[in-house]
UniProtKB/Swiss-Prot annotation:
PANTHER family: DNA-BINDING PROTEIN HU, INTEGRATION HOST FACTOR SUBUNIT BETA. It comes from Ruegeria pomeroyi (strain ATCC 700808 / DSM 15171 / DSS-3). Keywords: DNA recombination, DNA-binding, Transcription, Transcription regulation, Translation regulation. GO terms for biological process: DNA recombination; regulation of DNA-templated transcription; regulation of translation. Pfam families: Bac_DNA_binding (PF00216). Heterodimer of an alpha and a beta chain. The keyword Lipid metabolism does not apply. One of its GO terms (cellular component) is chromosome. It comes from the Bacteria. This is Integration host factor subunit beta. The keyword Transcription regulation applies. InterPro entries: Hist_DNA-bd, Histone-like_DNA-bd_CS, IHF-like_DNA-bd_dom_sf, IHF_beta. Belongs to the bacterial histone-like protein family.
């Protein structure tokens, strides 16, 4: 599912809301999650999961084509951990 499909589904299930309002709400949610993660905060959506940022330390890597060693800088990557309710539903337990 892509963002526009999510917006359309929410708008279809809530006919009292205009699609442009639903789009603003969805975009605001994504912006807030992104901003919180950019600050290094953890975003927890109970039952669904938690978004956080993990630090990957600098390391010595290898160029697979040439075999040369290369220095890979430290970086921060997004991480998602599923919540129990989502995990259970995906495994047919709910």
């Amino acid at each position: 599912m892509i963002r526009s499909e999510l917006i359309q589904k929410i708008a279809d299930e809530n006919p009292h809301l205009y699609q442009r309002d639903v789009e603003r709400i969805v975009n605001t949610v994504f912006e807030e999650v992104t901003d919180a993660m950019a600050r290094g905060d953890r975003v927890e959506l109970r039952g669904f999961g938690a978004f956080s940022v993990k630090k990957r330390d600098a390391r010595i890597g290898r160029n697979p084509r040439t075999g040369d060693t290369v220095h890979v800088e430290e970086k921060h990557v997004p991480f998602f951990k599923t919540g129990k309710l989502l995990r259970d539903r995906l495994n047919g337990k709910a």
